[in-house]
């Protein structure tokens, strides 16, 4: 083979030629780069970051997109979309520069400043036409340009005008923006979602920090490129999972935009396409109860295969420490744990990575909590003595009774967190609109129990983040422990919580209603069954009132049931060890109300009190076979007259009613029962189920 020998002069000539060609190609590439104009206000400009030039969302977007794109930041602080607003964007220099930029892609995020009382009340009717005019301006300047219209970033409750107009006007603007996107045939990009569950990334309740701007940049990057990391599913989808039987099942996941998704299970085959935002969903036909299904999901590039899938009954088990209380800690653990080998019961145990013990958390813990990485899970596990021992005792006993009665697979998801208050489990939008006061300065907020606030401050003690997150913070556990389930189909919920709200019965009544509203909206089921354990007996003065409040809530709210636990309490320990009766009493409610089984769901539930002279006749639901739990006379009944002073009363069973009277009360006006923090009340029905603490007004019927 001939060898080519290059002389030094020839080498220099060739090298120079390569340099010239490379430079020309580089210039050509630069000329052909895709131009992205980021149009907006101070949020686009980068207010809230230390260095907007490098840390604003357009700057971070440039780094993500790389040299094939040229991103321009055309944000101006205080800019309004409204042309008659206090600072119209279309009258600012940035608007002209953005037009001259000749963008191939225009990303518009305007409307936050239009919530100003100088703007929205007077000029709201101009918003849609003004927005359409802005879009037309860019399309005229660059025909064929791609327009991305952005939903507004959050404005938090700490904003000075949040309740006086900003919250509601922002909601109206969001609706208008969706209308604009449809009318203009523009793409709608959600810039609320990446920040909404991360209020610490909005230090002034409005402007994102560098990390928050990074979340916006990644969202816009996905919208521009359609790349979302390929096919993914929520963590709750795993081998050995249980899917809800006999109901249409909607699967939800993520993939790159436009990806063709194919799903197969049990002879069914379905397909759909991922939307522009990377989300996809499809609905399976109802599955019959069974085992050993295989679920396959593919986008053509990656296939997810879930084996050992069962179809059966799925329940979410939630609340605070008495739901988190482990089977190995229960009074009957020695007998029950070795018997817990039940392959048709499957457990999804969402355990906190850091317990809320009386200690300061590490920097790693604080950072993870801020990122909503609070739970850990080993996936779905079949029920064995080992897996059951560390699972919720109440949930285990509930699931065991369901399985024994129904003879179908049972899936239990437990996300309970010790010490957690009800407000931590309600979604942010619900609290913002229905109870915003509880969101402000939560570690100093009297709506929140002093112990809860003190423990949170102790855990967060070493944090330098002024808005450090914590599991007890309002909304946190919904965002970290419910939302990640991505509406995984469940038959219902069992709940054991209230100890951390017993200081304020009235606030809890609001919160409990909002909790049910929140979860039922989330799962799209207005009648989602919700069965809860009443607080037990404990020497805390407010608990009789709280237990009675829980009783009244059950009678007011649809698709609810309450398991009375006052007979299995511990006078000195907020964590009574008798959990088997609690789980089984909750299961009775489910078996009766959800599955139509003919068994008494609960203990005697007072209906009314009628006076005849000194005597009061109390009637009850679930009253068949009224008796006492210990064979002793009825006790803890009290009667009050017009003065409101209660006196001990004698009580006897008459058929399916109880008759009470007190020699000190001539004209009874009210009766109460079990009205001691730690009560030894003993009224039960034929099923051995105890009556709830109650206080009831007396209706006079004559003498």
Show which residues each predicted segment covers.
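Bacterial N-terminal signal peptides
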Residues: 16-24
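Boundary at the C-terminal end of the N-terminal hydrophobic targeting segment
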Residues: 27-31
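Conserved SGNH/GDSL esterase-like catalytic core that processes O-acyl groups on lipids
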Residues: 33-38, 43-132, 168, 287, ...
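Non-catalytic, glycine-rich low-complexity segments
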Residues: 229-257, 309-317, 324, 589, ...
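Extended acidic/polar, glycine-enriched regions
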Residues: 252-335
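Catalytic-domain carbohydrate-binding cleft regions of carbohydrate-active enzymes
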Residues: 274-276, 324, 335-336, 341, ...
């Amino acid at each position: 083979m001939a060898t080519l020998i290059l002389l030094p002069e020839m080498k220099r000539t060739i090298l120079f030629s390569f340099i010239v060609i490379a430079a020309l190609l580089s210039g050509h590439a630069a000329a052909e780069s895709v131009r992205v104009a980021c149009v907006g206000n101070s949020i686009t400009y980068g207010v809230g970051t230390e260095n907007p030039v490098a840390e604003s969302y357009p700057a971070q977007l440039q780094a993500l997109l790389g040299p094939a794109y040229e991103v321009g930041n055309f944000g101006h602080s205080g800019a309004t979309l409204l042309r008659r607003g206090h600072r119209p964007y279309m009258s600012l220099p940035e608007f002209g520069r953005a037009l001259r930029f000749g963008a191939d892609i225009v990303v518009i995020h305007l409307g936050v400043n239009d919530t100003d009382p100088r703007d929205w009340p007077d000029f709201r009717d101009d918003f849609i036409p003004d927005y359409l005019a802005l879009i037309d301006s860019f399309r005229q300047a660059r025909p064929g340009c791609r327009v991305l219209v952005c939903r507004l970033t959050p404005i938090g409750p700490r904003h000075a005008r949040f309740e006086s107009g900003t919250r509601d006007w922002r909601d109206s603007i969001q609706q208008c923006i969706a209308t604009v996107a449809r009318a203009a045939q523009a793409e709608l990009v959600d810039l609320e979602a990446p920040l909404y569950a991360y209020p610490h990334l909005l230090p002034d309740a409005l402007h994102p920090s560098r990390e928050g701007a990074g979340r916006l940049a990644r969202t816009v990057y996905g919208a521009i490129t359609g790349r979302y990391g390929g096919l993914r599913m929520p963590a709750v989808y795993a081998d050995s999972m249980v899917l809800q039987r006999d109901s249409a099942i909607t699967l939800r996941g993520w993939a790159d935009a436009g990806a063709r998704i194919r799903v197969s299970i049990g002879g069914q085959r379905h397909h759909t396409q991922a939307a522009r935002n990377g989300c996809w969903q499809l609905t399976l036909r109802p599955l019959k109860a069974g085992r050993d299904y295989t679920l396959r999901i593919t986008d053509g590039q990656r296939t997810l295969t879930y084996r050992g899938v069962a179809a059966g009954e799925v329940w979410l088990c939630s609340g605070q420490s008495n739901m988190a209380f482990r089977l190995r800690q229960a009074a009957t653990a020695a007998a029950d744990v070795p018997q817990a080998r039940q392959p048709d019961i499957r457990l999804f145990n969402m355990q906190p990575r850091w317990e809320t013990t009386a200690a300061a958390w590490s920097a790693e813990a604080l950072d993870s909590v801020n990122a909503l990485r609070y739970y850990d899970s080993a996936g779905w596990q079949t029920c064995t003595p080992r897996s059951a021992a560390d699972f919720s005792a109440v949930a285990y006993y509930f699931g065991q009774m369901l399985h024994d009665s129904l003879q179908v697979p049972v899936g239990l998801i437990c996300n309970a967190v010790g010490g957690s208050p009800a407000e931590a489990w309600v979604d942010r939008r619900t609290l913002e609109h229905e109870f915003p006061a509880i969101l402000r300065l939560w570690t100093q907020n009297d709506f929140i129990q002093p112990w809860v606030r003190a423990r949170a401050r102790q855990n967060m003690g070493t944090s330098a983040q002024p808005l450090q997150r914590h599991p007890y913070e309002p909304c946190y556990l919904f965002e970290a422990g419910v939302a990640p389930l991505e509406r995984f189909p469940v038959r219902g919920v069992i709940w054991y919580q209230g100890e951390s709200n017993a200081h304020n019965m009235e606030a809890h009544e609001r919160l409990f209603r909002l909790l049910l509203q929140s979860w039922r909206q989330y799962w799209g089921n207005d009648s989602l069954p919700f069965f809860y354990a009443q607080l037990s007996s404990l020497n805390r003065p407010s608990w009789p009132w709280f237990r009675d409040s829980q009783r009244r809530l059950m009678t007011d709210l649809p698709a609810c049931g309450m398991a009375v636990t006052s007979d299995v309490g511990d006078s000195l320990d907020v964590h009574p060890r008798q959990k088997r009766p609690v789980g089984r009493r909750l299961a009775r409610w489910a078996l009766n109300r959800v599955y139509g089984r003919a068994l008494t769901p609960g203990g005697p539930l007072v209906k009314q009190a009628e006076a005849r002279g000194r005597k009061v006749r109390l009637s009850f639901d679930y009253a068949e076979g009224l008796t006492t739990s210990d064979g002793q006379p009825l006790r803890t009944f009290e009667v009050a007259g017009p003065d409101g002073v209660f006196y001990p009363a004698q009580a006897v069973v008459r058929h399916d009613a109880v008759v009470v009277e007190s020699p000190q009360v001539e004209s009874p006006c009210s009766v109460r029962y079990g009205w001691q923090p730690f009560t030894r009340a003993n009224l039960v029905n034929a099923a051995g189920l105890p009556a709830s603490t109650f206080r009831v007004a007396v209706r006079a019927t004559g003498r």
